[in-house]
Amino acid sequence: MSDINTARLPCIGFLGIPSVGDDIEMVLRHG
């Protein structure tokens, strides 16, 4: 799953945490 998340949002690599990074990115973009 981590591979899919990183593939969808490369920016996640900056955070270093695909799981948490995905949630944060989703909130920031939808927020």
Curated annotation (Swiss-Prot):
Residue ranges of the propeptide: 1-10, 19-31
Entry PTM: Processed by the macrocyclase-peptidase enzyme POPB to yield a toxic cyclic octapeptide. POPB first removes 10 residues from the N-terminus. Conformational trapping of the remaining peptide forces the enzyme to release this intermediate rather than proceed to macrocyclization. The enzyme rebinds the remaining peptide in a different conformation and catalyzes macrocyclization of the N-terminal 8 residues.
Cross-link (Cyclopeptide (Cys-Pro)): 11-18
Molecular function, one GO term: toxin activity
Annotated keywords: Toxin
Domain of life of the source: Eukaryota
Family classification: Belongs to the MSDIN fungal toxin family.
Function: Probable toxin that belongs to the MSDIN-like toxin family responsible for a large number of food poisoning cases and deaths.
Name of the protein: MSDIN-like toxin proprotein 8
Gene (UniProt): MSD8
